[in-house]
Structure formats: structure tokens, C-alpha cells
């Protein structure tokens, strides 16, 4: 278990992380979302003991990261957003050296594990190719494979599928899930909403260095002005009778801009015929009706201070 207890990190006069409290459960995949500069990378580097928190406390399996940095470091593997691989070495040697530094495996065990992970990501044939000659996607695979081969207790991935094509993205998600299923706790920082939703057990949203929301993707969508949005186009010049929708407990908010009316709902799909009937009986001329589900992107924009369109 990983715990952030009112943790903060300041660089000069800049508070990169502020009063941050969160618990990450064992053997879960936590997706970390936030705008650029929100503090996601700083959080991960504090967890990995690269940065020391300037306030509060961070613990990993009950150990304070400041008091027990070496013990914590042995449990964590980090795949960085920008691949940190020695360009002179080939992929095989990069991974073999990484395992030598981070595990107690013997030479045969290391080589066996490296071969398995390189074959899994379709890099075996390029195992001796110097990484500086590789494409960005191939280098990113090598970076991710360092953690996949290490199989740490806590695995941290910063934008794990950046530069990857669609088949490679799907494969990387599968391998990250398998890492979790093997007993690792996984943290994935990403700017891709589909990645966060399809990969994560829970999603944490960070904004301006603070935790603003954390829950399962479905629960987050359900909390964002209901799980669905009903968009109506009514006759020009009509004042929308909001009060007639007060009878429906599922209606959470109503807004109108000219002849465009937006109704935020929970359980709106089953409620739609009743709402249309009620409005028609009140003399509202409805020109069009569109029901859409709130997406994780909507949730993200809402929690980071952007207006949903």
C-alpha cells in the first residue's frame, strides 16, 4: 500500500504538489490524470525517492520514503516518459544491465527474462540494435520493458504508450495488466483518456498540484452532473420551464443558451420519454433531442476547471 499524507513539494517559490493525500491499494492499477504541469511526474518521483517531499509524509508498505529510501527504492521500478536508455547498447544489454542493478537474478535467469519480454513486445529480432538507431516507439518499448522485466512490487509508468502504434498500445496494456495480476501495484500517468479508462481500476485526477478526484472511471462519470446529458433544441424565443423537471430526482442541473437546453441526468436513458412527454404537455416545442453519455474526458475537463461543452 502507498500512502500520501498531506504531502507537498516546493521548488523555490513554486508549489508543484500541495497538501496531497491519497492511498493506493495493493495490486491495483491507478491511472493518474492531470493537465501538463499538474504535478503528476513530481508525485511519481517523490514516491520513487528521487525527490524528497518538503512537507507531509509518503509511505510505501508502511515505510517512510525519507527515512527508508534504500528499502523503498528496491521495491519500485519506474519507466520514464522520455526513454532513459544507453544509446550505445542494444535492447538486450539495456534490459540485462537494468535487471543486474535492480534484482538478485543470476545471469541465466536475467537472460531468460529479457528474452521473454523482448519476444512479447516484438523486439527480439532487434535485440542487438543500438537503441539510438531505433525509432521513438521502439525506444519507448525498451524503456517500458525495463519495468516489465524487473517485475517490481510497485511499477510506475509515465506515458507508457507514447509513440506506440495501436497494436503496440493494446499489447502494452495487456502486459501491464499481467504485471498487476502477478502481484504488482501499478501507477500509470497518462494524458490519454481511453488508456486511463480501459486500463485503470481507479483514476486519480490531479490539478495544480492537488488531488481533485479519485474513483473508478464509471463512478467518476456518474458523479459529473449525472452520467448522461440530454441536449434539446426548442422553439426560438421559448423560455424553458425548468420547474416542471423538478419532479424528476434524476435531473441534477439544467442550463439554457438561446434555444439550446442542456439537462444533466443520472439514469437519463430510461427517463427520456417521460421528460419529453412532460415538456410537450407544457407546450414546449422540441425540435431535436440528443442523449449522450458523460465521458472520462468530460470528467477531466470538469474537475480541472473547464466548462463542459
Each PLM stretch: what is its role?
Residues 56-64, 72:
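Conserved ABC transporter NBD signature motif
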